[in-house]
Amino acid sequence: MSKLIYGLAGPTASGKTSLSILLAKKINAEIISVDSSLVYKGMDIGTAKPTLQEQDGIKHHLIDIIEPTGNFSVADFISSVNKLKKEIWARGREVLLVGGTMLYFKGLIEGLSALPESQAEIREALEYQKKAKGLQYLHQQLSEIDPQSAQKINPNDQQRIFRALEVIMISGKKYSELVKTSKVGGLDEELKLCALVPNDRSILHKNIESRFRQMLDQGFLDEVQNLRKNRMLTKETTAIRSVGYRQAWEYLDGDISYDEFVKKGIVATRQLAKRQLTWIRNWQSSINIVAMENETKELDILKYFGYK
């Protein structure tokens, strides 16, 4: 039986960091960060990078691994996870993926490939069949057409079942054969992914504003001033396009006032959270949704992971 990989996703300021530490302790896991901003050195305050104290003895990976002038693509992330998971398992621990960069999660779930683009009409047809005959029926159909793919896909994983059948219908070829020739990375193991979502969006918005102002008190602008000493960095650099940093850069350039900077920074963070929640909504049939306000969320997630 293949190993499981555990995951905790959610929008920014939803409480992932503190919850992930509790979960990691319960399941004896090391954490792999799924955050495209945490990879950068020298970008600590504006990314809400967990401090050593906050990490509380839990080993974290993919934090502070490249300079802000560098890039860390989805392919780089997938390759790193596939290497790290083996090392973590060799130490007798579990793998817990934690973060909010949904493209990274998508890369793990689907892999990167030259497979045909999704087609709305085929998705609608599959959705109709699922409603009429059930997801198990579609998984059985996949088993008859492409048993190798069906064996690797959990019968309850709607997203991957739909994608496999969609590719077969578009290309006329087995999904397993196409993936072998065009896939870069992805996970062979089942990912048990939970996502934190707010029942009340206004609470998340308050958290975002509160955290942004706390970052300012902690010296966020000083951090950005220090980054500006590197002449290779501009507001168009990938790292500096992270929410908050670009707005701070514009303020320090004199393009906007301090009040405009604060307002734009908070709005940009809210927009990021909205995009993250859209990703989660699209995945809700194949992942476990947990309300961030739920007082028993730790226990609920552990139960979903298979722990008491």
From Swiss-Prot:
One of its GO terms (biological process) is tRNA modification. GO terms for molecular function: ATP binding; tRNA dimethylallyltransferase activity. Its EC number is 2.5.1.75. Signal peptide: none annotated. Pfam families: IPPT (PF01715). The keyword rRNA processing does not apply. Its cofactor is Mg(2+). It comes from the Bacteria. The record marks T101, R123 as: Interaction with substrate tRNA. Substrate binds at T12, A13, S14, G15, K16, T17. Belongs to the IPP transferase family. PANTHER family: TRNA DIMETHYLALLYLTRANSFERASE (PTHR11088:SF60). Monomer. Catalyzes the transfer of a dimethylallyl group onto the adenine at position 37 in tRNAs that read codons beginning with uridine, leading to the formation of N6-(dimethylallyl)adenosine (i(6)A). This is tRNA dimethylallyltransferase.
